[in-house]
């Protein structure tokens, strides 16, 4: 990169960047408006700009963000685009800074011409601002006045120095030595003895150019430029600039500027210029201008005789030759002490006399402008340079530098003279030459189908200036500078200065890509204000450049403008955003970094009046016009038939003004004497050939020319400025006559007339007063007329549509408000509905309705609604002012509010108060019923209360509720701990806690559980006491239920351990009973073994069916169903006393006996059936009979020896029972009686105990009957029949098969006693293919009584000696004597009588016992006789030879027992014959039972032992029911045990 274009950021400045500038840290101006149009709005750019114009005009600039999907492709060829940027030194841009630099340049030039070296002094470690010092001294009256009045301290204070440090004297010395000689020179005091030179003489041949920055428009790129750099901040040293001898004056001036940290002035011979910069250390001397200390410079004498030629021009003397100075400009001589002010020493450099110095310093400076860089860039190379510069300057990546930091640093740099930062700006690159960034037709960039839409987009800057709505489209002259876009490639700090667009037109700028561009804008109405402020603050700049602000070379800090009340706005334009500037809106800005932008001018119809005003302004400034405004108007008027009616109307108005002005000017010219005229086609001339010589205005309508100056023209405003010839020699050149202009204007008028009439009607309708307003229908008619006549969619029509739409919306809203319907009573979230108005908005809406340009029918109705809403507000306010309003009243008022579709401010508070009132009522209601007030209810109420707005009543209720909850939770937790306490608490302590809990007005779950536990404990104790006090033996289930209940009660119960022990004893007793009775792995339960069988045969089912058919006798309760063990167990459990249990078991015994008898007969019959009956099913397997088989002694069914276990031959013959019939071990009675005794000691009733008692009673009863049978003669008769071969077996056994079938030592089915050895030998066998290993006593071989006795013997689960004795007696062989006796005819009769007598004795004994009982119970003699009569026929039934006879006998016996039971049932205590004394004796008698229950009252029933002791026992103590006591003999346990050995 060449040195001329290299950018040197220099040392990094310290941050924050407040800088030493006059304004301190930069404060950003307010933001300008930012618009984000919808797609519909974005479709027409001119319509959108017209829409936003009222807003954006107030700020001068605005930003437009296109819709997000609008992203035009970048159409520039990046590789082929190249440009030469402009060089910008930032501190030369700012107006006030440039004034300072110019002043310092003049001071430097003055001292340079005086041959002295200039040092910039430092005061208080700060560089002295010579410009400010000079200005302040001048404001105070000058050097002499300040010294006289001693104002140096005041001046030092104004310059920012601290007072009291003798700074004033230092400043005075610096001023006196540096500035005072210069001011004396300017005032002319140094030339008072000389004739002042004419400063206005032409000195072009010696012209001095201190800046060498020609105007921007005429600068040519130089081959080389001095390297730009950032000067270091001057800290504590002054800069001493030495001028080398070989350097020219211009070079020294250049170096002087560089040493002062100022922009370097350029010289004409800059190509060979070299700069030498040196910083010298601080010198403590106060003086600033230092003369040469070496050999004083004097005029060297060329010849000895020429000395007299040099004399002082002031004093005329040639003396003091060594003090005589020779001017290097004019060779005049002066004494150093004759000069004003005098010089102490001879300068070391070239010296100019006051005359030459005045001539040099009076030369005007050339206009300031930008110079072009020497290097040509492409986008790529410029971007690399720009990014490197910004990254190095801020020492961070470019994208991380905040825009605020860049902005503050920019304004600091442009305001300081100490730092020289130079940047480059690729500005004003013609898109015509390099292509636009937007796609264009026939462009080099190929577009996708989606991107082709951008070719015709109105926002494509190539299209916007030439669109139909743009006025510039009608200009045929070549104004490509305004109609074609310009490209701008920026870098960090590159800027564009304050300016307005040509002809005060609009401009639009689009940032294609890159970093943001910061804009500042001033609205058009403040343009002259900005100009005046800048002229006031920097008047020196406008002396040489009156049109400075049109040159785009001057910038001023926005804060400075805002301080002088100039409105300034800013924005950051990001990539993809537009910035629009409005007519006459000054704007400036800078780039944040490398970016690419494109801009173009355009003019809308509303600009036309401003455009004419701008031309007049240009005429005053003598500024060139880009095009002729009048020519444009006439061009548009010439094609009035195709103009838009709005454009035609506007052009017609502007043309009328033009014609009037032209008519007046031509009349003025005519009065001056100009009479010659000629038509001239001005549009055919180049613009520079038809410009007014005076004001530079482009002439079109007319001009004045003179033959003395051919080719020169003046406008009619400056006729007198053409030449000195008399006016009659002038010639008026015109384009149109007035007669030509009027038809053109009328054509425009005709084109716009219908529209104007319509527009007039629209304006009248829009601006009508209240009493003259039209209806909404009239507005719609105007819109329909515009559509029918195809008027343009201009601002007026859009405004009419907008007003109509607003009116329609207002009508719709008004109707909705009048309907007064809300969708919901309460909206979620509590927020304001978007469709609802507040009362204030309603009031404003009503006001808006009255302010509408049209009249709505809903307006008066809505006014009435507003009145009703205001009444509601008054009532609601009154209700809300009450301390405790009722919920009902609040709800009623809220219901009224639902009629209004208005957001009422009171509703929120009313709903809050309603919630509070409802909550308070809910709390009050909950507290009225403490039993239903749970902890969760209290917590819920508290949670609801917490969510309520603060209110005193709520807070009080909350406090009470919280206190109640705290107490309740405390006691509930305490109750819970009491319930879970181990060991458990006593009933008294828990009852005390319950009393405390009952005082709490709330429902406590654990408290309720504690209360329930206490109540359950009391009930339990009451039940236990009742059980103990009743005198009854407790039932096991009752005890278990009590124990279970007691264990579940969390209270310490004293009786519970005793009951648990009792239940444990019962369980132990049951375990002992199980071990005694049940076999190993028995499928039967203990109760099932002890109770009579309920699962025998099918008799149960038959009896059930028969009972269903038999009606119950009147007055009798239905008997308990005993068809299964569960029925029997339930009946035993439900029985309240032992007697009823025994009766139940007795009934079960009868069922068992009957069912088994039927089963035995059926099985016997099955075995006696014909052989060909193949349906016979036997055995456990229920298959057909097959030898070998064995027959069960009890059920008489046959079983295959392969299916069951049978005894071996070695074991002898034993009674065999099948698995169904053998249910227990059948322990001997001696093992059972201790169980009964221990059960009586336990004194607990349980089904198994009742069953055991009944089984023992049944066993003892069977023993008694068996003993009677054995002692009677009836058994002999049976024995004879058995022995005589009446007993037979159908099947014959095979000994070998039996022995091989079973080898078990003791099969489960065998009994514990043996049969006679000759049992099989005495049996007659029939030949049959079936045979059994054992034969049973045939049923028809014995009497029914014996058969029943034998059957019941096997049913008994007890081993008795009488059973074996009975079988041995029946199956023993008769002796010969017995056989002889049996053959005797008399013996049998005798034996029979004996037998009958024995039997009769037994019966008499029973009758005596029965009679004794009946007498004791007071039975009448008649009833006893009836009983005796019923029992007497038994004598006839002694001989029982058939089962039918046996059944008749049983029925008769049961009838007698039933009579006894009936007599017992009907003998109530009131009918008894006992006296009260006897009753008391019975009650006081002692029961000898081991575990006497000591019953009282109705339970004192007695039974006498029929054994040897004859003692009386309580029936309930020995487990005997009244029925059993009447039907059977009772032998106590002691007699049973005592008599058992004798019976053996």
From Swiss-Prot:
InterPro entries: ARID_dom (IPR001606), ARID_dom_sf (IPR036431), JmjC_dom (IPR003347), JmjN (IPR003349), KDM5_C-hel (IPR048615), KDM5B_ARID (IPR047981), KDM5B_PHD1 (IPR047978), KDM5B_PHD3 (IPR047979). Fe cation binds at residues 499, 501, 587. The modification Phosphoserine is found at residues 986, 1328, 1456. Signal peptide: none annotated. Changing residue 324 to A: No effect on interaction with histone H3. Residues 202-214, 1389-1400 have a biased composition (Basic and acidic residues). The modification N6-acetyllysine is found at residue 832. There is a cross-link at residues 148, 204, 209, 242, 274, 278, 769, 1450 (Glycyl lysine isopeptide (Lys-Gly) (interchain with G-Cter in SUMO2)). Residues 1376-1387 have a biased composition (Polar residues). A zinc finger (C5HC2) spans 692-744. GO terms for biological process: branching involved in mammary gland duct morphogenesis; cellular response to fibroblast growth factor stimulus; cellular response to leukemia inhibitory factor; chromatin remodeling; lens fiber cell differentiation; mammary duct terminal end bud growth; negative regulation of DNA-templated transcription; positive regulation of gene expression. Changing residue 328 to A: Almost abolishes interaction with histone H3. Decreases by 44% demethylase activity and repression of tumor suppressor genes expression. Residues 97-187 form the ARID domain. Several specific inhibitors are being developed and tested. The inhibitor KDOAM-25 inhibits its demethylase activity, resulting to cell cycle arrest in myeloma cells. Keywords: Acetylation, Biological rhythms, Chromatin regulator, Dioxygenase, Disease variant, Intellectual disability, Iron, Isopeptide bond, Metal-binding, Nucleus, Oxidoreductase, Phosphoprotein, Repeat, Repressor, Transcription, Transcription regulation, Ubl conjugation, Zinc, Zinc-finger. SUPFAM superfamilies: ARID-like, Clavaminate synthase-like, FYVE/PHD zinc finger. GO terms for cellular component: chromatin; cytosol; nucleoplasm; nucleus. It is found in: Nucleus. Belongs to the JARID1 histone demethylase family. This is Lysine-specific demethylase 5B. It comes from Homo sapiens (Human).
């Amino acid at each position: 990169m060449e040195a001329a274009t290299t950018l040197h950021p220099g040392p990094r400045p310290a941050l924050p960047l407040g800088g030493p500038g006059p304004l301190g840290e930069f404060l950003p101006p307010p933001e300008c408006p930012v618009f984000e149009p919808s797609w519909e709005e974005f479709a027409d750019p001119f319509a959108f700009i017209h829409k936003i114009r009222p807003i954006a005009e107030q700020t001068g600039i605005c930003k437009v963000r296109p819709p997000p999907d609008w992203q035009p492709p970048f159409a520039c060829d990046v590789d082929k685009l190249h440009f030469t940027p402009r060089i910008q030194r930032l501190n030369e841009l700012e107006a006030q800074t440039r004034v300072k630099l110019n002043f310092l340049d003049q001071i430097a030039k003055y001292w340079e011409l005086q041959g002295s070296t200039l040092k910039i002094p430092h005061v208080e470690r700060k560089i002295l601002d010579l410009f400010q010092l000079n200005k302040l001294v001048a404001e105070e009256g000058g050097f002499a006045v300040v010294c006289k009045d001693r104002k140096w301290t005041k001046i030092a204070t104004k310059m920012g120095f601290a007072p009291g440090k003798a700074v004033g004297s230092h400043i005075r010395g610096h001023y006196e030595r540096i500035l005072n000689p210069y001011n004396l020179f300017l005032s002319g005091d140094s030339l008072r003895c000389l004739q002042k030179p004419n400063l206005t003489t032409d000195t072009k041949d010696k012209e001095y150019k201190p800046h060498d920055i020609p105007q921007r428009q005429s600068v040519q790129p130089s081959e080389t430029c001095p390297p730009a750099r950032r000067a270091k901040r001057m800290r504590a040293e002054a800069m001493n600039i030495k001028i080398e001898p070989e350097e020219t004056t211009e070079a020294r001036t250049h170096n002087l500027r560089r040493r002062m940290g100022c922009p370097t002035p350029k010289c004409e011979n800059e190509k060979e210029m070299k700069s030498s910069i040196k910083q010298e250390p601080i010198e403590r001397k106060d003086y600033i201008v230092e003369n040469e200390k070496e050999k004083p410079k004097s005029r060297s004498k060329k010849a000895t005789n020429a000395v007299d030629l040099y004399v002082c021009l002031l004093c005329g003397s040639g003396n003091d030759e060594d003090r005589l100075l020779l001017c290097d400009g004019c060779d005049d001589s002066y004494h150093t002490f004759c000069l004003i002010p005098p010089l102490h020493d001879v300068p070391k450099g070239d010296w100019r006399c006051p005359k030459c110095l005045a001539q040099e310093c009076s030369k005007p400076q050339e206009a300031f402008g930008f110079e072009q860089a020497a290097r040509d860039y492409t986008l790529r190379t410029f971007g690399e340079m720009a990014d490197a510069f910004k990254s190095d300057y801020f020492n961070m990546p470019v994208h991380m530098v905040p825009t605020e930091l860049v902005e503050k640093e920019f304004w600091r740099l442009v305001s300081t003279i100490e730092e020289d930062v130079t940047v480059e700006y690729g500005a004003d690159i013609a898109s015509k030459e390099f292509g636009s960034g937007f796609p264009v037709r026939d462009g080099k960039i190929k577009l996708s189908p989606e991107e082709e839409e951008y070719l015709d987009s109105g926002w494509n800057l190539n299209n916007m200036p030439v669109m139909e709505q743009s006025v510039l489209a009608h200009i045929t002259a070549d104004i490509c500078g305004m109609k074609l876009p310009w490209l701008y490639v920026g870098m960090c700090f590159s800027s564009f200065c304050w300016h307005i667009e040509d002809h005060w037109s609009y401009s639009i700028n689009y940032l294609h890509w890159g970093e943001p561009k910061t804009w500042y804008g001033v609205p058009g109405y403040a343009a002259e204000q900005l100009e005046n402020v800048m002229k006031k603050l920097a008047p020196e700049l406008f002396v040489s450049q009156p049109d400075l602000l049109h040159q785009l070379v001057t910038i001023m800090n926005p804060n400075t403008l805002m301080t002088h009340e100039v409105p300034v706005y800013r924005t950051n334009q990001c990539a993809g955003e537009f910035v629009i500037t409005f007519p006459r809106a000054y704007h400036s800005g800078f780039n944040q970094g490398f970016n690419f932008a494109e801009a173009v001018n355009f003019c809308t119809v509303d600009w036309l009046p401003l455009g004419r005003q701008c031309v007049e302004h240009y005429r005053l400034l003598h500024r060139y016009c880009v095009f002729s405004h009048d020519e444009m108007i006439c061009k548009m008027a010439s094609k009035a038939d195709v103009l838009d009616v709005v454009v035609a109307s506007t052009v017609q108005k502007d043309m009328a003004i033009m014609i009037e002005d032209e008519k007046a000017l031509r009349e003025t010219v005519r009065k001056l004497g100009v009479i010659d005229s000629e038509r001239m086609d001005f549009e055919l001339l180049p613009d520079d050939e038809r410009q007014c010589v005076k004001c530079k205005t482009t002439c079109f309508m007319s001009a004045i020319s003179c033959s003395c100056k051919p080719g020169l023209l003046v406008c009619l405003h400056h006729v007198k400025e053409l030449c000195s010839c008399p006016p009659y020699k002038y010639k008026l050149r015109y384009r149109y006559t007035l007669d030509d202009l009027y038809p053109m204007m009328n054509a425009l008028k005709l084109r716009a007339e219908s529209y104007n009439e319509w527009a007039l009607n629209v304006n009248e309708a829009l601006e009508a007063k209240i009493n003259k307003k039209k209806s909404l229908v009239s507005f719609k008619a105007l819109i329909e007329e515009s559509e029918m006549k195809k008027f343009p969619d201009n601002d007026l029509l859009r405004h009419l549509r907008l007003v109509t739409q607003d009116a329609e919306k207002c009508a719709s809203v008004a109707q909705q408000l009048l309907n007064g319907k809300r969708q919901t009573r309460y909206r979620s979230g509590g927020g304001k509905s978007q469709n609802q108005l507040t009362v204030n908005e309603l009031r404003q809406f009503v006001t808006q309705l009255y302010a509408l340009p049209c009249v709505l029918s809903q307006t008066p109705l809505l006014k009435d609604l507003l009145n009703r809403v205001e009444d509601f507000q008054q009532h609601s306010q009154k209700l809300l002012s009450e301390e405790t309003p009722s919920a009902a009243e609040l709800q009623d008022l809220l219901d009224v509010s639902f009629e209004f579709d208005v957001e009422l401010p009171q509703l929120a508070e009313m709903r809050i108060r309603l919630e509070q009132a409802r909550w308070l009522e809910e709390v009050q209601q909950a507290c009225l019923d403490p039993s239903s007030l749970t902890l969760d209810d209290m917590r819920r109420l508290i949670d609801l209360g917490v969510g309520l707005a603060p209110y005193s009543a709520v807070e009080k209720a909350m406090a009470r509720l919280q206190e109640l909850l705290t107490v309740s939770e405390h006691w509930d937790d305490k109750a819970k701990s009491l319930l879970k306490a181990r060991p458990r608490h006593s009933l008294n302590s828990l009852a005390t806690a319950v009393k405390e809990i009952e005082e709490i007005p709330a429902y406590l779950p654990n408290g309720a559980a504690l209360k329930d536990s206490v109540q359950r404990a009391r009930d339990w104790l009451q039940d236990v006491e009742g059980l103990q006090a009743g005198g009854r033996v407790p039932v096991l289930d009752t005890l278990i239920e009590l124990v279970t209940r007691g264990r579940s009660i969390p209270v310490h119960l004293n009786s519970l351990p005793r009951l648990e022990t009792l239940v444990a004893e019962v369980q132990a007793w049951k375990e002992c009973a199980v071990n005694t009775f049940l076999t190993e792995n028995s499928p039967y339960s203990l109760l099932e073994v002890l109770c009579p069988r309920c699962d025998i045969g099918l008799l149960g089912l038959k009896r059930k069916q028969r009972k269903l058919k038999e009606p119950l006798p009147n007055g009798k309760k239905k008997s308990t169903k005993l068809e299964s063990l569960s029925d029997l167990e339930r009946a035993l459990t439900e029985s309240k006393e032992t007697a009823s249990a025994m009766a139940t078991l007795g009934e079960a015994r009868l069922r068992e006996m009957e069912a088994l008898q039927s089963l035995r007969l059926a099985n016997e019959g099955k075995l006696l059936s014909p052989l060909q009956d193949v349906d016979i099913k036997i055995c456990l397997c229920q298959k057909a009979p097959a030898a070998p088989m064995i027959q069960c002694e009890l059920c008489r069914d046959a079983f295959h020896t392969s299916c069951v276990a049978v005894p071996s031959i070695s074991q002898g013959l034993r009674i065999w029972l099948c698995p169904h019939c053998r249910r227990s071990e059948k322990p001997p009675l001696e093992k059972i009686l201790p169980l009964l005794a221990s059960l009586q000691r336990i004194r607990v009733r349980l089904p198994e105990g009742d069953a055991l008692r009944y089984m023992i009673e049944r066993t003892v009863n069977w023993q008694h009957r068996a003993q009677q049978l054995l002692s009677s003669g009836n058994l002999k008769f049976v024995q004879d029949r058995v022995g005589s071969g009446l007993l037979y077996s159908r099947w014959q056994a095979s000994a070998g098969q039996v022995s091989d079938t079973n080898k078990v030592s003791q099969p489960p089915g065998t009994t514990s006693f043996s049969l006679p050895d000759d049992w099989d030998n005495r049996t007659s066998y029939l030949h049959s293919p079936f045979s059994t290993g054992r034969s049973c006593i045939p049923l028809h071989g014995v009497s029914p009584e014996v058969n029943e006795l034998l059957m019941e013997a096997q049913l008994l689960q007890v081993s008795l000696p009488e059973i074996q004795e009975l079988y041995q007696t029946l199956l023993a062989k008769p002796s010969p004597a017995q056989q002889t006796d049996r053959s005797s005819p008399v013996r049998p009769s005798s034996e029979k009588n004996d037998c009958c007598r024995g039997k009769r004795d037994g019966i008499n004994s029973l009758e005596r016992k029965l009679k004794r009982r009946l007498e004791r119970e007071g039975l009448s003699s008649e009833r006893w006789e009836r009983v005796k009569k019923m029992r007497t026929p038994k004598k006839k039934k002694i001989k029982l030879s058939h089962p039918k006879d046996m059944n008749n006998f049983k029925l008769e016996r049961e009838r007698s027992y039933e009579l006894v039971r009936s007599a017992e049932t009907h003998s109530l205590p009131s009918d008894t014959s006992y006296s009260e004394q006897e009753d008391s004796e019975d009650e006081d008698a002692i029961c000898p039972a081991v575990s006497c229950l000591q019953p009282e009252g109705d339970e004192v029933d007695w039974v006498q032992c029929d054994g040897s002791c004859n003692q009386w026992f309580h029936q309930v103590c020995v487990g005997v029911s009244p029925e059993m006591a009447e039907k059977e003999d009772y032998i106590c346990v002691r007699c049973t045990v005592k008599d058992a050995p004798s019976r053996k």
